[in-house]
Amino acid sequence: MAFALLRPVGAHVLYPDVRLLSEDEENRSESDASDQSFGCCEGPEAARRGPGPGGGRRAGGGGGAGPVVVVRQRQAANARERDRTQSVNTAFTALRTLIPTEPVDRKLSKIETVRLASSYIAHLANVLLLGDSADDGQPCFRAAGSAKGAVPAAADGGRQPRSICTFCLSNQRKGGGRRDLGGSCLKVRGVAPLRGPRR
């Protein structure tokens, strides 16, 4: 019996308009936005009055074309920030499509997405190391037990509750459903198992 390991489709294939920024580009975008003057919010009277009580000149506030330059810089910074925010949101959308959730159409917040992705990566690492064909369908618990030796005792002398992997629990609830399909949690999301007609 042979099994094929299916790889998930990369986000760049599903979302070709997503451009990954390097850390330097992201930091530059953020610092550019924070370095800009907020002179665009002032009225024309404030621009004619000149510098405020603090004396000195503002960045970009000198000369007759100063307010226009400041407005353009602010608009450019806003456009960069919109693009950055859109690319982050698109990346989160791509990540959400790769993480199994119950119910399937559940909307995850950004922090839930990051936490669930981290948990799912740990689960898949345990599946790769140990396989998911354990009797109880919980390879993550087996990995935690073998790493710690046993479930640690609580301060009051009792045993602490065992840690539960969401994905192992989901597998266990579904019974042998995934194991019947080849015993792998590594199926590409979106490929539904063949089911008989509903009654």
From Swiss-Prot:
Provide the Gene Ontology terms for cellular component: chromatin; nucleus; RNA polymerase II transcription regulator complex
> One biological-process term from Gene Ontology?
establishment of epithelial cell apical/basal polarity
InterPro entries given in the database record:
bHLH_dom (IPR011598), E-box_TF_Regulators (IPR050283), HLH_DNA-bd_sf (IPR036638)
Keyword Nucleus annotated: yes
The species is Homo sapiens (Human)
Give the protein's function: Early transcription factor that plays a key role in somitogenesis, paraxial mesoderm development and regulation of stem cell pluripotency. Essential for the mesenchymal to epithelial transition associated with somite formation. Required for somite morphogenesis, thereby regulating patterning of the axial skeleton and skeletal muscles. Required for proper localization of somite epithelium markers during the mesenchymal to epithelial transition. Also plays a key role in regulation of stem cell pluripotency.
UniProt keyword annotation of Ligase present: no
Gene Ontology molecular function terms on file = bHLH transcription factor binding; DNA-binding transcription activator activity, RNA polymerase II-specific; DNA-binding transcription factor activity; DNA-binding transcription factor activity, RNA polymerase II-specific; E-box binding; protein dimerization activity; RNA polymerase II transcription regulatory region sequence-specific DNA binding
Q: How does it assemble?
A: Heterodimer; efficient DNA binding requires dimerization with another bHLH protein, such as TCF3/E12. Interacts with MEOX2.
Locate the compositionally biased regions of type Gly residues: 51-66
Report what the protein is called: Transcription factor 15
Task: Keywords in alphabetical order, please.
Answer: Activator, Developmental protein, Differentiation, DNA-binding, Nucleus, Transcription, Transcription regulation
